[in-house]
Amino acid sequence: MSDLQSIADRVEIEALRGEFTDAVMMRDYDRVASLFTPDAAWRMPNIPVELTGQEEIRAFGERVPRFVDYLVQTTHPGTIQMEGDTASGRAYICELIHPSDGSSELNYAIYHDRYRRTTDGWRFAERVYEIRYLDTSPLAGSAPPTADGAR
């Protein structure tokens, strides 16, 4: 593989991670599911949730609004190790979560990822969410009122 191909692969994987965060923030669960391979696993052991395949991932996402009023997720670049048509890496996450039960969460976490090149581009073969810091103190702020048609 040429150096140029390696650079292109890294850019595509970084774009995949950004697309995931955007899809989660926009509550676009069809798009979230499409970012995974058909046989992918998404594991969140601290919650605990384990999902296998695009349909389980989509269905979980569609349930999220029942127990989360809003969340803000930011993803920070991590590492990517290329291995031909597969790769592994880590992305660093900060989340503010306001569950519908009125509680609050601020966490810092790591996504441990495995990626696979497909005919549609790079996709997640596995995402494992590891919370490294959790603060359940009440959040001082809130989501602002939304304008008509805003998401």
Regions found by a protein language model. Name each.
Residues 29-94:
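A solvent-exposed, acidic/Ser-Thr-rich amphipathic alpha-helical stretch
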Residues 10-18, 30-31, 85, 90-92, ...:
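Binding-site signature for planar aromatic cofactors or substrates
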Residues 88, 108-138:
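Short beta-strand edge/turn micro-motifs at domain boundaries
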Residues 135-151:
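Acidic/histidine-enriched, glycine/proline-rich intrinsically disordered or flexible terminal extensions
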Residues 96-104:
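Short, cysteine-centered beta-strand-loop-beta hairpins and adjacent loop/turn segments enriched
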Residues 95-97, 130-131:
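Short, surface-exposed beta-strand-loop junctions and turns on beta-sheet-rich folds
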Residues 1-38:
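Short, low-complexity N-terminal intrinsically disordered segments enriched in polar/charged residues
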